[in-house]
Amino acid sequence: MPKLTASEQTEFLSTPGILMRIACLRADGSPLITPIWFIHHENAIYFTPRAQSEWLGCLRQDSRIGLCIDEQDLPYRKVIIEGQAELIHDLGEDDLWRDLYRQIAGRYVPADAAEAYVQNTIDQERALWCVPLTGSTVKSWRMPLDGEPANGIWHQRYYAPGTHFSDS
């Protein structure tokens, strides 16, 4: 599958309504995967765990994280990010970043509903975390578009040697 160009990746990560799944580790080493809202801002992925969310505790104890952002329709764009989550604002500092919270909510619901959501949950503390793209492992791909080679549907490493689309 072709890798997304830098502009395709930025456009995709800015597309409203696409959920992100985060993967982090529980204290016992078992994985925890959660679908959440996010925003791509200043070359980083920002997200906001609630005070009572299990994954906030996981990130506090081990900030290694995997992020999966993908779409359900053609061309099935995907971005996988593996890196370290960084705490930007802790619980109780919500007023310092509330405008970004509105922007995050506004990616998923209309502006009036986003404002209502923020106001209705204003007394519920959240933390603000991010994963910078620089310094993280970022992989992206999509289905081949019209006019692109059909063998691009898979990466070359997946074709068995000597088969139709293999290089050997």
Across the structure, where does each feature detected by a protein language model lie?
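Short amphipathic alpha-helical segments and helix-helix/interface helices
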Residues: 9-10, 56, 101, 119
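Short, basic/aromatic recognition patches
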Residues: 1-21
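Short, flexible segments with low predicted structural confidence
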Residues: 9, 30-32, 110
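Charged, gly/pro-rich active-site loop segments
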Residues: 1-4, 78-168
